[in-house]
Amino acid sequence: MSTSHLKKINTPEKLLGVLTAGHLVNDFYNVTLPFLLPTLIITFDLSFFQAGILSIATSLFSGLLQPVLGYAADRSGKRKAVILCGFLAFSVGLVAAGFATSYIMLVAAFFIFGLGKSTFHAQSTNFITSAFPTSRGRAMGIHGIGGSIGNFSAPIIATSLIVAFALREAVFLMAIPGILMVIFLAWTLSDQVSNQKQTPPLMISRKLILLAINFGLILMFYEAFLVFLPTFLIEAGSSLSEAGFIAAFMLFVGFLAQPVGGYIHDRMGGKVLFAASSITAAVALLVLTSGWDLPAILFIALIGASATATFPVALAMGSEIADGANVGLSVGMVFGVAGMLASVTPAMTGYIADLFDMQTAFRLLTVLALAAFGLSFFLPGKST
């Protein structure tokens, strides 16, 4: 195992702890937009389709960048610099959004913000899987806990700041964690320099493409659901604070689901986890939008748990397919393709909601989860 990335962090466990903290802040930013949207829709008089375009601005180009940055980091070993630039982009984008006075300026601000989404996952996965070669699923599950804490804290923090302050002050305050994480990681993390004497060939296998598309279908489903969940709940009669609490509960359950997903991966393989997660999410959303008098929060939580359980598994499977060569490219490919696919569904969902209603738009998302269920049977089996 290469230990060059442990120069400042002298054990794999400490490395995992530092990157889990980084994952917390990274994924806090990844789910911030949905909880800003209700206020942005009112402030800028946006349609649901225009709101969906903001999601495209944060995701499409970042999806293209992920495999490119992953491959560049594989060649240069400059993983630390890539990660730091990502957190800086999050903060700069939020500050720019605070100064935006038009829709075009808002799209540009969230484009900058979205660049931050292209940097962290591939680099942190390479660090962690090289440090934990025999327990990748468990390590990535623990790493996922940080992301889940960031996820479920985002609705509470974002909605609380918007209620307590004006939109501009709220986004300025939300930019602070990114700056603090740049300082923290600059001090604690060292670049990983490859020990390989020869550069491995650039290869994208059929297994990797299947994994990227399958994860992309799940992320398409989840991204659209998450982006419009607060709006859906507010239309159903919830206040902004209540919608934030329900979304936070869903993301808290996702916090519990990620290490469970990693455990299932290590024991039974990613194929089983992907199949079970996608069919469960589809059924739960059908029940949620059926109009039956059932506790909606439970089915919302089940949807969140099913989708987020696949996140650490997709990372672990991507690194396994790479088998030590071009891990950054492999993981960047999985998250990049998935991110690009997912970037279009919020706008599509918003367009359908403009034509019909949000309930109909949500119901149609089950097609994506069912497609992921069918494709999951072609994924690689348990790694031995």
Protein language model annotation of sequence segments:
Residues 134, 142-187:
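Helix-loop-helix hairpin linking two adjacent transmembrane segments in secondary transporters
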Residues 324-356:
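A late C-terminal transmembrane helix in Major Facilitator Superfamily
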Residues 110-146:
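Cytoplasmic helix-loop-helix junction between adjacent transmembrane helices
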Residues 271-317:
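C-terminal transmembrane helical hairpin of 12-TM major facilitator-type secondary transporters
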Residues 88-101, 280-292:
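C-terminal ends and interior cores of transmembrane alpha-helices
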Residues 33-34, 207-255:
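Extracytoplasmic gate region of multi-pass secondary transporters
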Residues 45, 77, 99-104, 133, ...:
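Helix-breaking motifs and short loop linkers at transmembrane-helix boundaries and internal kinks
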Residues 65-77, 258-269, 353-354:
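Helix-to-loop junctions at the C-terminal end of transmembrane segments
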